[in-house]
Amino acid sequence: MAVAQCPASCGELIQGWIMGSEKLVSCPVDWYSTVEVSTGSPLADERPLSRAMVNQLLAHWDYPAHLSQDIRVSIHSTIPIAKGMASSTADIAATAVATAHHLGHELNETTLAQLCVSLEPTDSTVFQQLTLFDHNDASTQIPCHSQPALDLLVLESPQTLRTADYHRIPRQAGLQAGAPALKRAWEKVQEACAQQNPYRMGEAATLSAIASQMLLPKPDFDALLSLVEECDLYGVNVAHSGSVVGLMLDRQRHDVEYVKWLLTRKKLTEHWPEQHLLRMVSGGVQPQ
């Protein structure tokens, strides 16, 4: 049996029109999809995209297609689905690496990214480093070589939106309008990583979140911004094609219980009734 795990993402640190196309930098957090691949018949309730990934890998290495019927994929994940937390990328990327190991192969990050985008738009959680990524065709992969330490209070909404449905929304005009802000946001991400500066990362994410309001507005967004200001948090990041929001902070320095109390007082918990305190971590799929 081969096992691999891939982290979820709290939305994106930034996403928008950068250098001529829509690109993103995911925000990997310590919540994982773990996938076991073993010899056996496929499970009845398996996820179609994971099976599609198995079939792609068999073709990639010139195995006969019928071998798929002897490969069992078991996914263990509590990552919320269709909320902007990269649950699908985590499942299919971990499936890819576990299947590769099961077949006796290694997968580098670039090949993994290309395999994933051929199935669906993909989050940059597949890379160990924070990476500016063209999530539609994998043509751009620009890594940041370090990242600041920070925590996220992830605000989970009951609202769901499939990534494919988001991509059907006409958004070209909004993307173009946000391009100057996204240029600045990407510069700030690079500075934040070079300087290990969480405040600079918060500025980058907040710029992108504000630009995203033109495309997929979050409710009571101004109240979220005022809470960030009031508590001197690093910033706010959002799922640009989902409903989650992240309050960027340091659990040692900021009073998380007070932040939660304020969320209730400002009635923001009506939109985001569940909260999860998570760490931003390195991305990448790890064999277990």
Kindly give the residue locations of the regions a language model identified:
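Solvent-exposed alpha-helices and their adjacent loops that cap or buttress functional pockets
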Residues: 4-6, 16-18, 26-29, 124-126, ...
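Active-site catalytic microenvironments for nucleophilic, acid-base chemistry
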Residues: 56, 60, 98-105, 118
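A short, flexible beta-alpha/helix-coil linker loop
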Residues: 79-81, 208, 243
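ATP-dependent small-molecule kinase catalytic core of the GHMP/sugar-kinase superfamily
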Residues: 108-234, 250-264, 268-288
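Small/polar glycine-rich anion-binding or flexible loop at a beta-alpha turn
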Residues: 239-246
